[in-house]
């Protein structure tokens, strides 16, 4: 999960200029990418939201071309990339292993606004359905997205040899 400072460094490494507090006239505009400049609204008051907006505008700079202000498909593509880059299924599992159970705890641990986490859950529900499993080095986890978000570690069952095979092996 990239930090805000890490995203700033990445933008600079890509030759982009970031204006961190731009006075947009519309309160609806949180960030904008034009040519080699990313501007973030001065009205963004939390680092979590600033991180999300910068990552999305950086994604636009890397993957979009032309004017996409009225292109909801490109906006959704950038948003989906953002969900995976800033949180991802493994990020949700790490937060669960750190003790998070409520949505506000997940948002705080993952350094994203709760509204972003809600959008992420809706996106993952649309992409993965109500349940998906993820294998990590800490085990296999089931993530359910409906009716509420839950993470559960799956305990593998032991393989018990069948009686017929055991007798056959003993005879050899």
Please place each PLM-identified region on the residue numbering:
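Active-site hotspot residues in diverse enzymes, especially metal/ion-binding acidic/histidine motifs
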Residues: 1-172
């Amino acid at each position: 999960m990239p930090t805000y400072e890490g995203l700033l460094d990445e933008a600079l490494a890509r030759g982009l200029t970031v204006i961190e507090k731009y006075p947009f006239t519309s309160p609806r505009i949180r960030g904008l990418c034009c040519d080699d400049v990313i501007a973030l609204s001065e009205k963004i008051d939390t680092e979590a939201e600033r991180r999300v907006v910068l990552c999305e505008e950086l994604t636009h700079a890397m993957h979009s071309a032309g004017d996409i202000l009225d292109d909801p498909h490109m906006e959704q593509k950038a948003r989906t990339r953002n969900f995976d880059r800033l949180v991802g299924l493994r990020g949700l599992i790490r937060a669960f292993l750190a003790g998070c159970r409520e949505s506000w705890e997940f948002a705080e641990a993952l350094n994203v606004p709760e509204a972003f986490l809600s959008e992420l859950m809706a996106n993952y529900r649309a992409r993965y359905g109500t349940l998906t499993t993820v294998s990590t080095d800490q085990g296999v986890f089931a993530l359910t997205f409906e009716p509420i978000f839950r993470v559960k570690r799956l305990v593998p069952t032991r393989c018990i040899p069948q009686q017929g095979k055991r007798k056959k092996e003993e005879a050899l």
